[in-house]
Curated annotation (Swiss-Prot):
Name of the featured protein: Alanine--tRNA ligase
Family to which this protein belongs: Belongs to the class-II aminoacyl-tRNA synthetase family.
Catalytic activity: tRNA(Ala) + L-alanine + ATP = L-alanyl-tRNA(Ala) + AMP + diphosphate
Gene: alaS
Pfam families: DHHA1, tRNA-synt_2c, tRNA_SAD
Gene3D superfamilies with a match to the protein in the record: 2.40.30.130, 3.10.310.40, 3.30.54.20, 6.10.250.550, Bira Bifunctional Protein, Domain 2, Threonyl-trna Synthetase, Chain A, domain 2
Annotated function: Catalyzes the attachment of alanine to tRNA(Ala) in a two-step reaction: alanine is first activated by ATP to form Ala-AMP and then transferred to the acceptor end of tRNA(Ala). Also edits incorrectly charged Ser-tRNA(Ala) and Gly-tRNA(Ala) via its editing domain.
UniProt domain comment: Consists of three domains; the N-terminal catalytic domain, the editing domain and the C-terminal C-Ala domain. The editing domain removes incorrectly charged amino acids, while the C-Ala domain, along with tRNA(Ala), serves as a bridge to cooperatively bring together the editing and aminoacylation centers thus stimulating deacylation of misacylated tRNAs.
Amino acid sequence: MNSTVAPASVADIRKIFLDFFASKGHTVVPSSPLVPGNDPTLMFTNSGMVQFKDVFLGTDKRSYVRAASVQACLRAGGKHNDLENVGYTARHHTFFEMLGNWSFGDYFKRDSLKWGWELLTKVYKLPADKLWATVYIDDDEAYNIWTQEIGLPPERVVRIGDNKGAKYASDNFWMMADTGPCGPCSEIFYDHGPAIAGGPPGSPEQDGDRYIEIWNHVFMQYDMQPDGSVKPLPAPCVDTGMGLERLAAILQHVHSNYEIDIFDALIKAAARETGCTDLGNKSLRVIADHIRATAFLVSDGVLPSNEGRGYVQRRIIRRAIRHGYKLGQKAPFFYKLVPDLVTLMGEAYPGLATQAERIAQVLQAEEERFFETLANGMQILDETLTGDAKVLPGDVAFKLHDTFGFPLDLSADVCRERGVEVDEAGFHAAMEKQKAQGRAAGKFRMDRALEYSGDGNDFVGYERLTEVTKIVALYADSTPVSELKAGQAGVVVLAATPFYGESGGQVGDQGAIFSDGAMFDVADTQKIKADVFGHHGVLKSGALKIGDVVTAHVNASLRAATQRNHSATHLMHKALREVLGAHVQQKGSLVNAERTRFDFAHNAPVTDEQIREVEARVNSEILSNAATQSRVMDIDAAQETGAMMLFGEKYGESVRVLDIGASRELCGGTHVARTGDIGLFKVVAESGVASGVRRIEAVTGQNALSYLQDLEDTVTQVAGTLKAPVVEINERVAGVLDHLKSLEKEIAALKGKLASAQGDELVTQAVDVKGIKVLVAMLEGADTKTLRDTMDKLKDKLKSAVIVLAAVEGDKVQIAAGVTSNSVGKVKAGELVNFVASQVGGKGGGKPDMAMAGGTEPAKLPAALASVMAWVSAKL
């Protein structure tokens, strides 16, 4: 492995590490998923050795005995939980990358330590006088290798004893478990210098930041016995791990991991999306760290949920959102960082790039969900923590968790910033109390936000949209009140109501509640209990009191549009079962005035032909104009009619059976009187939302007509551009594409001729430098292929040469570097192209004899090209 200059980027550090160990006979192994496939006891992959655990235990064998990898790791749950420190220290992260090399019964201490020293001092070029090492107190072999063979001064090799209270309980003795493979380890430290507080390893001041551990070499040479004794292993192994971010901080001459190139870019992206101008703000650090963790988790199949790994994911996402909110961002922003992350890490982790769109969708959905309650939750925190409060009560922390979706550690994060502790015992007691109440209730959990003990409402919304009725309860800020005044937001409960409360996927009605001098705008209707509807809105004028007689009026146009979509959903469900199969089951739905969104069980995308068939069946039912019928009957009788029942849904003794066309389902929603009232049905989107779950979105009535008219406008515009009748668009487009292909072939042929001609002309411009021809040139109008073709011809003609060719197209720079085979021992094309690209805002890579790069600063290209001669001369 040749020496090289200190790498300028995290990407360089990764590549150099893997290349180095590949040159030492190691097999480069890809990073394993963050969800361990071989260890159900481990929540997340937290080190490079996880994927090799079975090899060390002897239950698995590999085709190689030496391995190296760059492993994606996560520490944010369970035993290894750094979440509360992330963003507040220089080196704590949720997601991090671990550089590692392993020997499975092959080489041992001597090669491991010597290669480590070679890589750090000869390749990465760390100053040898800045490095320290620790060894286990009894490990004379490792100590002698450091002091006698490598030449590290004895005063910088520290023996660490059993500093944890028992034999082999030491920072420098590693055990996989209470019994089994174990052994001493040797850690390499970097000294940041006397300007930073802290003492050397093993000293009382070792916890400072001056001496930082960068690489741990574990030597598994013993088998720990149940009695605490050790026996030699027949085939000792090596397991090493080096934090990429820590190493990058040293190589890039910064003290904090958050100052390295990859975090610098993510912090700037977070600042862009939050509007924060202080790049040193710790909240930006949190966001930059968390986008890595959450994106990689989604990439590995971990979606936000309320349990297990999914809840860790939710906690991390919501912590990032809260820090964005703290910076003044009141709308979803976090998902917008995904493209930045893909740019930085997509090449090293291809799965990140291929799933970028899905990752952004998952994060955006979680953001939208949390932003609905974040402001209210923060208001409660602010009110509770006013004055000289020293503790956040456990019941308040639980309310934030249960009602507003605040994970406990998010509330603790806010409290820590204000010097306040959280009563965690009280929190857990409140949670256990709720669980006990839920077990006792056994059936229906009531809305905890509004306490109502009166009679149920009389729902008249199936028959009419207006009802004269009486106010029986009023609420403001979730608290019962006797009166609402103008300007107040609140909830109104009526003795009878035509408003439908959100249920079964259908949104709640909107409208107005009014009396002489009072007008209450109803923005939403939600169930407080199964038979009690709360009308949520704002009192625009006058006053409302309990006992007032009022008129309740539903917005008729919104109700009608919602009914069309709901009835169409039933017809679509029936059609999907007929077209795709009886396995189709509803998994979720949302029906409002704009569209219907229907999630269902199905393991493959619905084809265009299948969608057309579903549309045809639904529209056929609409054209039949069949009357809708509803009947209330007991559950057993409903089952005998063959009515479709949703799997997992809880039904009472009496149910409402709804017949719409050929569909028969149990449903309490509102529907059209006849199928013809739907007007028209059109599917507008089909997608996957989870493993085995598909989603169809559709529109009806006027919305369907508008959608088709928009499509027609687009088709008409395309026809106009092509100067062809609409019916001939396909034929005309095919002709244009054929003509385009023909032109592309002609252009390619011309470029080939141009490359040949330019090659002949450029040969005369080559300069002899120490016996090797060096050629640097700009090619006008060339693309990447032309650069490559010209490069190949020049290498053939010049025989022994180093060549750099460049071209500019708009604001983009393309650079090619080529080295003939007899010169690659002195000059590497990859190093050369990166040298040039780094001066024009870009980077690249390739093989030793041919490499390509791009850039974004064409104005700097002439100076960059002018510097090539001196660079090459220094290498020769």
